Regions:
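Solvent-exposed interaction patches of small proteins and small membrane subunits
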Residues: 1-106
């Protein structure tokens, strides 16, 4: 039996996993950042992808807070700080989103 805190953390990881799978699905035919910029459909994909990347970063921040910073360091091969930083860049960058950076992130 998991504690309420553990259930929340597991749910956050599941949301992250689902978001990553959607990102991969939505972007499987994107060959470079220009694919986002050359059509209205590409721009929609860029905007939607940014929202999921932002949600992933926010979920990672919540996990880190709920575990008092003790869980994420157990997986140092994952660039957690970059994930959270990308969230901040998208959330506060507004119209300064770099399509190349989003493409490389995905």
């Amino acid at each position: 039996m998991y504690s309420d805190r553990d259930e929340i953390i597991l749910a956050l990881f599941k949301q992250i996993e689902d978001s990553i799978l959607l990102l991969l699905q939505w972007n499987q035919e994107v060959r470079d950042a220009n694919d986002y910029l050359l059509s209205p459909e590409g721009m929609k994909n860029l905007a939607a992808s940014c929202m999921l990347i932002e949600a992933i970063g926010e979920s990672v921040k919540k996990i880190d807070r709920r575990t008092d910073g003790k869980l994420l360091p157990l997986r140092p091969e994952i660039p957690w700080k970059l994930v959270m930083g990308m969230r901040d860049h998208i959330a506060h960058g507004y119209f300064d989103i770099d399509a190349d950076m989003v493409f490389l992130t995905i």
